[in-house]
Amino acid sequence: MDDLVLVFHLVSTCIMVGVIWFVQLVHYPLLAVVPVESATQVAEKHQRWTGFVVGPPMAVEGVTTLLLWANTPSGVSWWLTWVNGAFLAVALLCTIFLSVPRHARMVAAPDAQVGRELVQTN
């Protein structure tokens, strides 16, 4: 069971890394060429649709982190699970306190500077 939790955690983390790289390298740069009159609608759709993509793997990451804390697999140092949890917490806090407010600003008043800030803080 512990090994399966570790595999699910690894897979969900890899999915999130892939999504983040896609957003950084493809999606956010494309937002810079969206016409201003469409930017608010695009930003709203981005927020709504992104939740469907990132919600499940983020939930799996969170649950499996807790399970790994409770039952560290044999061969894995207990402190690695805590470092992993700390990194996950930092990523989540950056999303909540850096990315989400910038997305809200992008919906309210589309601006190229906000787009650059999204890339820098993601």
For the regions a language model picked out, list residue spans one by one:
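Amphipathic, non-membrane alpha-helical segments in soluble helical-bundle scaffolds
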Residues: M1, T50-V53, V76, L80, ...
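Helix-coil boundary and interhelical linker segments in multi-pass alpha-helical membrane proteins
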Residues: M1-H9, W69-L80
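Interfacial loop at the N-terminal end of multi-pass membrane proteins
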Residues: D2-V60, A104-V119
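Membrane-embedded alpha-helical transmembrane segments of multi-pass integral membrane proteins
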Residues: S12-V19, V60-N71, N84-C94, L98
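Acidic, low-complexity intrinsically disordered regions
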Residues: V17, K45, T65, G75-W78
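Short coil/turn residues that cap or connect secondary-structure elements
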Residues: P35, N71-S74, C94, P110
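Alpha-helical membrane-embedding segments
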Residues: T64-G75, V114-N122
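A mid-sequence interfacial segment
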Residues: A86-N122
